[in-house]
Amino acid sequence: MNIEVTQIIINQVYSKIKEYYGKGSLDYPKLELHKDIYARLSGDEEAEGEHSTTSKAQYDDETNVIYIYYPNMVNEEDVIRSIIHEYTHYKQDHKLFKQYRDMYSYNENPIEIEAHKNEEDWQLFI
């Protein structure tokens, strides 16, 4: 999906997602669109790595930003699910992130289970 279409979807749904799920302990997170996770982290726009084609979105609790990797978005549903998933992480207790990551596999992590469950609400925002 290209950056323009992704941005249109974000413009249509993000305020609804914020209203539905409410505000967390931090200000509402900004959303930023990026081509690649490695390019974003390195500052080199051409950088790629093993997760370049699979990373869809990421919430960074230190910067309070949701990063969307638009080339990996398949369709509108994918964009909405990704925003909901990362917004759920914004709302969660950030102190538990590392603790749970050390205790559980990704699929057994209660933080990830909640985020995946919330993704099922995606049709509410169309």
Give the location of each predicted region.
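Short, solvent-exposed loop/turn segments at secondary-structure junctions
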Residues: Y38, M73-V74, W122-Q123
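Post-HEXXH active-site segment of zinc metalloproteases
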Residues: E77-R81, Q92-L124
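Histidine-centered divalent metal-coordination motifs
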Residues: H85, H89
